[in-house]
């Protein structure tokens, strides 16, 4: 793969439009896996996705030009899945399984175009929403976040000269390589790139992926970015996300259906993927509530991804549950992925080494760590915590509780209703940086 001079590309503002999102496969792999399930089981469900800036001190609408944002969003609406991409999706093996995507699904996907968006400003923030059929709207999530984040980066660097930019990227590369050197000290490490949604830029994410591929070799297990996996001959990694139980819960008509929502989506997932990709994401309505009510068969799944509790605390809770269920944690897998920096990866690895199989999904602190790289402080280079979540399903409010109350989403009255229903045990606030 040809290496780009990132500083030169940033400095050269001559192009009419430098697309941030170059392909609909410039997304997380689990979006495609979930999309197939949505297409198959929920074809008539309407949803609303909403942009949520959790770093409220940052006024995104003051940093990003609205015309540039609209141009990038409009460009995404022109994209489809190319013939080359369809051939790769149909013929490649994922997690050791061929034809994971059904031919009928790929035929439908070949004609997809993303629906319209709604954009306005309020109090220094953009109000960005996507409405429509779930199976047509869900692919907006990752491009929308990547666009917002890269436009912030571009705006922050726009006034700088080439040599200043060259120094910034040289320092960022050196900082990244220092992380690689530290990770090389962990025998048996398994780590992958989860950094698409909050990356500094597409080119920078690609550089980071190539650096990990060369720097830590087999310890680098792949990337969640489908396009980069295809172009770099890497494993595409990922399973499922919170939107599945969130929608299932929103659609529930009875308390029994609400209680069963987190487990029903797992059963449907297991059926669709024939016993593969069996990783549980337990925290949509609180991990303790999930483990308390989980059917015994959940303990037979391959592993868990604790996503919003501190990694050591969350991992210990799941290990204790496995032991209670009579399972050997050494045969199970924990995937840690919540806001990890190198120190957290090393501490977590050393804490659990020999007790459980581990893998790490490295996100924002891999693909958007420019703190200390500029000659002076540039606020726009500091990553923010921004998400794009389902807020409605068939006109009914959707909720995510999380193990961290600061990550909860939904209308306050609905959040309170869910808390009364599922309980608030072991939910603890801790700062959300990314």
Curated annotation (Swiss-Prot):
The modification Phosphohistidine is found at residue 242. Belongs to the NAPRTase family. One of its GO terms (cellular component) is cytosol. Keywords: Ligase, Phosphoprotein, Pyridine nucleotide biosynthesis. The lineage of its organism: Bacteria, Pseudomonadati, Pseudomonadota, Alphaproteobacteria, Hyphomicrobiales. It is an enzyme of class 6 (ligase). Pathway: Cofactor biosynthesis; NAD(+) biosynthesis; nicotinate D-ribonucleotide from nicotinate: step 1/1. GO terms for biological process: NAD biosynthetic process via the salvage pathway. It catalyses: nicotinate + 5-phospho-alpha-D-ribose 1-diphosphate + ATP + H2O = nicotinate beta-D-ribonucleotide + ADP + phosphate + diphosphate. Catalyzes the synthesis of beta-nicotinate D-ribonucleotide from nicotinate and 5-phospho-D-ribose 1-phosphate at the expense of ATP. Transiently phosphorylated on a His residue during the reaction cycle. Phosphorylation strongly increases the affinity for substrates and increases the rate of nicotinate D-ribonucleotide production. Dephosphorylation regenerates the low-affinity form of the enzyme, leading to product release. Its EC number is 6.3.4.21. NCBIfam families: NAPRTase (TIGR01514), PRK05321.1 (NF003704). GO terms for molecular function: nicotinate phosphoribosyltransferase activity. This is Nicotinate phosphoribosyltransferase. The keyword Phosphoprotein applies. Pfam families: NAPRTase (PF04095), NAPRTase_N (PF17767). The keyword Ligase applies.
